[in-house]
Amino acid sequence: MDTLASLYTKHLATLQQRARTILERHQLDGLLIHSGEPIARFLDDQDYPFKINPYFKAWVPVTQVPNCWLWIDGVNKPKLWFYSPLDYWHSVSPLPQAFWTEQVEMTAQRHADDIAALLPAARGNVAYIGPNAERARSLGIDEAHQNPQAVLNFLHYHRAYKSEYEQACMREAQKIAVDGHQAALEAFRAGMSEFDINLAYLSATGQGENDVPYDNIIALNRHAAVLHYTHLERRAPSEMHSFLIDAGAEFHGYAADLTRTYAANGQSDFAALVAEVNQAQQALIATLQTGVRYTDYNLQFHQRLAAILRHHHILTGISDEAAVAQGLTTPFLPHGLGHPLGLQVHDVAGFMQDELGTQMAAPDRYPYLRCTRIMEPGMVMTIEPGLYFIDTLLAPWLEGEFGQHFNRGRIDALRPYGGIRIEDNVIFHAHGVENMTRDLHLA
């Protein structure tokens, strides 16, 4: 098996080839990639938690250090100016010595403003990739070369194809997240609050709330009906009905994004509903293959969802086909089936059909679907169907043209549980799909 170091060498060669292509196409001398800068809180002497430029961590696994720079010409070793000030007020990251450092030409940068003197003098024909336009201007980068859209389109599009190194990092992120999910489930079964369940998760992963790739969703009971619930109640509810956890982890800048839902009473109707959504998700994953547009799989799950809703008498007096055709499944599943995953949780280019940036929007019926691409080898996607009882979405349907098909009694009985989401992370390969999450036996 290849080591992470050897996989990184191949990964870097791929990035260099992409850089050569885009530099030649637009007659540029190089890419100047900025890790980013701290952002100060208003009227405060503290900064917001730092989040690095995803294009920086694509080249080097540096994820928490601001004021760093990469110079890429596609031919020579990437030049890395690593910010390492002499500072007794704050902890300072030392110059890295790791599996990847021999592949770059690294120099310590003691002051953030030193970069102007360290960079090559000729910078008029360089593309700046980063978050700070003012800094780019101060370095003499023309506005037209600051995050040029044509360059970003090319880079975004090809980010969908994960190298073997990236896939290996994402498998490691899965392992960390699975440890957290198992600890969180134990905390739920022990009757802990959302706040304490989250602490158990973070402790098990060894990652702080600013290290995980997104704010953890730890939702008990009705809170599971809020798709991005992040409030974290300090007290446990007097009665436990359900637990939805959507929480991830990072490894070398690459994300895992996993969701599970549990019933407090394993013999309840809600537990049976969770089991059926889980089975439907696994059945859909068994059909995944390259060469199929992701929108087709989204529609396929709505067909499966209609069958579940009818089986549990939540929808009545209508066929599966008619329920989907008339949109009756949409208030129960308002989000899309999933999204690209990688350097960012909602990774870029889900709608891009080519490297020029041609877009295909989500279908009108499913406007929150985050991907319309044809699946190809190397793509990493989440598969995260759900079934929710959201008052604001159900109300117009209950009173509308098709209201007679919605079983109010069943819906009212299930409202206290909030909802269900089951999410796995999969890699598309030429001859099949790898479910990284289930391979680690996360039930």
Swiss-Prot record:
Required co-factors: Mn(2+)
Catalysed reactions, semicolon-separated: Xaa-L-Pro dipeptide + H2O = an L-alpha-amino acid + L-proline
Top enzyme category: hydrolase
Coiled coil: none
Recorded GO MF terms: aminopeptidase activity; metal ion binding; metalloexopeptidase activity; phosphoric triester hydrolase activity; proline dipeptidase activity
GO BP, one annotated term: proteolysis
InterPro entries per the UniProt record, alphabetical: Creatin/AminoP/Spt16_N (IPR029149), Creatinase/aminopeptidase-like (IPR036005), PepQ_N (IPR048819), Pept_M24 (IPR000994), Peptidase_M24B_aminopep-P_CS (IPR001131), X-Pro_dipept-like (IPR052433), X_Pro_dipept (IPR022846)
Binding site for Mn(2+) 1: 257, 339, 384, 423
Organism: Edwardsiella ictaluri (strain 93-146)
SUPFAM superfamilies: Creatinase/aminopeptidase
Keywords from the UniProt entry: Dipeptidase, Hydrolase, Manganese, Metal-binding, Metalloprotease, Protease
Lineage: Bacteria, Pseudomonadati, Pseudomonadota, Gammaproteobacteria, Enterobacterales
GO annotation, cellular component aspect: cytosol
Protein name: Xaa-Pro dipeptidase
Residue sites binding Mn(2+) 2 per the record: 246, 257, 423
Taxonomic superkingdom: Bacteria
Entry keyword Lipid biosynthesis: no
Enzyme Commission numbers on file: 3.4.13.9
Family assignment from sequence similarity: Belongs to the peptidase M24B family. Bacterial-type prolidase subfamily.
Gene: pepQ
Role of this protein: Splits dipeptides with a prolyl residue in the C-terminal position.
Cofactor annotation comment: Binds 2 manganese ions per subunit.
